[in-house]
Amino acid sequence: MKLLKNSICLLVLTLLIATIGFSPQTKASQENSFGLEKPVTIEEKETLTVDKNGVAKSTNDDQASVIKNARQLANQSDHNEITYKNPTAKEENNIVNVPVVEKKDEKAHPKAASLVSMSYTTIYDPNKKSITTTIKIASIVGEKPIVIEARNDLYDSNTYSGKYGRVFVHSREFLGKDIKVGKSYSKSYYPKKTKFYMSQHTTVAGWKGSVPDTSTGTLAPALANKIGWLYPEIKNNHSKKTMPVPAKANFPVVPADKREEWTSTDRGNYIKKYIDKYGNPKWNWSALDVHHVLPLKYGGKNNFDNLFPLPRDIHQNVLNRWWDKY
């Protein structure tokens, strides 16, 4: 039987969501002005199937050969460095506008005689000051495989785009009684610096009498500060814009006397331009701060694209606190 690969990349964000309204209008008009999303866990699933109608068959169908072939395939995914480039992300003036990825539903496998689905998660926990990757057998349908080789390696970089170096290898082999739904492993890293992080996962599954095959997926970069706190994802539901991300994780501090100034005139000019561009949201602007995506402290400027309006409590209690640990 030929092993058929069907790679399902399911991005699941476990989010703490707070919706803030702040205009002096009615309650209905205040709601949904801004959405603050704080990702905690990012998950992907990989599903490998074996088709009962497959025509190809391994000439060495004993378990030892299947396991050996699976290990060889797993070793081919060993990369000390990976390169990331998102053609839809707009990077300009030290900030990156990253398009929001919509959640995709997992596809069914009506012709699959047997399948195994693996769950790969990356957990950012600022309380433990850790970043953890996990590997878990999510489901098994039909005959269980005799071997599963799985890995969920962590990579980091100082830039959103470009080369990422491996932080650690997290590889696991499932054999015999370990091949059961719910069996999982985890590995943690305790960052000391702000970085962009990516995880790359690989699954190799082999059934008796089949040729093992492999499936690989990579999670898009996520910016986390030195305590593992993910950069907040905030959407302005009036302008339909999501707050950009700083393009680097290692911007140096600019001396106070060298920083660009921010005055009440600059603030007024921004508000006028915002209304001209997006229309009047009828907000109580006195209750808002205008946030610099790249702060003046790190070389940010007063250009329109580097500015983002925020309720004062979010600006001071979320963004400023995040940057305190940059």
Predicted regions span which residues?
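Nuclease and nuclease-like effector domains acting on nucleic acids or nucleotide cofactors
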Residues: A28, S33-D289, K297-Y326
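Sec-dependent N-terminal signal peptides of Gram-positive bacterial secreted proteins and lipoproteins
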Residues: K2-Q25
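Accessible peptide chain termini
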Residues: M1-K2, K208
